């Protein structure tokens, strides 16, 4: 995943949080930066806020003991609002103002608990107070009691929905302290021993003492809290996970995100704890409404009322090596189905590919969402067939732009390594039983009619299960048979992807240079080189192709690349083709109308399939076999390279190229005089002998490497 994609995923999560959650998350991230980074961020913030007059007014009020004392005369609703806006602006060291806040907080919390009002606002106040650098150890210890009472009230309010009281109390009392105590904040080695938490000065940014962080002494044994609290996700709200109506501030119970999050790619490590929980039928209250991605910001945890013990032992395939599930969160995000990430986190790749609509219905997934999930999974099964179709299009000399766009879309989907030890012994015995229920969703959770529907669905989906793990006997396509290319087994999606990348490489090497296509191709390779589904051999091939394309790209005169856009516009005006170069047939006929000479303009574009370069049994394509014998094509190979249809990335497919091939009578080495004679004034692209030699050298190198490596993994592009 590219950096900008990672930032996009993080920004998506960030937008879904409330202000308190955003503050807590940023604070957690800032504790991981170096002193220089922290100082730089401080300068940026100070500069951007220098002219914020309203903020300066609020800050003065927030640090004035007299003004804070006057708030006691206001209504509780107004006081809560004032505290939420002013408490974060309290300056460390202002003891008088802090004392006033500590007088108000217990009153507000007691009122909220007694009348069961402003529960979420009270949580936010506790969050700010417990992480604020101005509060001391004694202050936080006193607030711990209110945290206990607050969670007790929450548990009592919603305890009728299969939720035990003890779980909520234990979690509320211990979660904050233990995730702070057990977190590894010694990442940069610049903590101090103050109990001020995190302050604006770099020297006081972090504090750490033996057995205590931010002044917190552990109140309970860390063994009482599952280890998953310290290892998964960014925030959690187990206490309210069983309630039928979702409050917008649901996750603010998590006062600080865990510190020791594993180093996972963004989109996996940033999944919240609730998004990574199982949501099985045994965890759902009978009166729970169907889940909906639009129900709330935190609806991904709405259906779970599981216990902390379940979280500690729950399997998370998103973080398992070789599971093929690491890209599922990002894939669901692109489908706007990321609220259901928890549903997939307990599945294997094969179980996900075998999902049916009835199984999703048993999990209380809404009708629209489950229909979209089933359709999306069906598209995943069709990826290998799509790759074969793209391969045929590329061989026939079609545009490269569309295949490259398809490949970019495909790499965002989950891809599992073919034939890995984790799938071979387990997945293959279940091949004929693809519709069978995954382990997460047993058959007992379905009605008889759903089972019949699942069987029917599986029967229709299995034949196209390209990458689903349900391997079917491969039928040799006409294209594969004609080209005598050894077919790849069904399910070998990385191998098929690599083969298509090789075809694209060959097309790029022999066609007119296109900066956009080359850049897109190199980005594809960069993403594949770090993907776990691809073998080392495949990655070596991809790296080799990347180097060839880069070398060829650098060998082209920069003037040619800069003039391509203007050149295309002129050609479009002359031939009436939008955003594409003319085919050989149209070029010949168009010049014939304006010029009695029947020779075509020398082109640096090289066709791929039409020149018969992609076959292994003979260098003759299907169209050329009908008109020309193989020896003739071999003899005219070099002439055809430069005068046949420019089948580059911007060419339109043409079946009439055989009628306009260059004749033998024209010399192989066209002189500059002849070149100028045949060219029209608007078609002035420099074609020099060194350019031709460089192109031939790169093409020969590519063909040789592909041919020599064809016997290893059968992903040759030749």
Swiss-Prot record:
The modification Omega-N-methylarginine is found at residue 573. Residues 323-396 form the SAM domain. The modification Phosphoserine is found at residues 168, 420, 580. GO terms for cellular component: dendrite; P-body; synapse. Pfam families: SAM_1, Vts1. GO terms for biological process: nuclear-transcribed mRNA poly(A) tail shortening. It comes from the Eukaryota. Residues 453-466 have a biased composition (Low complexity). Residues 278-310, 417-474, 572-601 are annotated as: Disordered. It is found in: Cytoplasm; Cell projection, Dendrite; Synapse, Synaptosome. The modification Phosphothreonine is found at residue 424. GO terms for molecular function: mRNA binding; translation repressor activity. Its main location: cytoplasm. Keywords: Cell projection, Cytoplasm, Methylation, Phosphoprotein, Repressor, Synapse, Synaptosome, Translation regulation. Belongs to the SMAUG family. Acts as a translational repressor of SRE-containing messengers. This is Protein Smaug homolog 1.
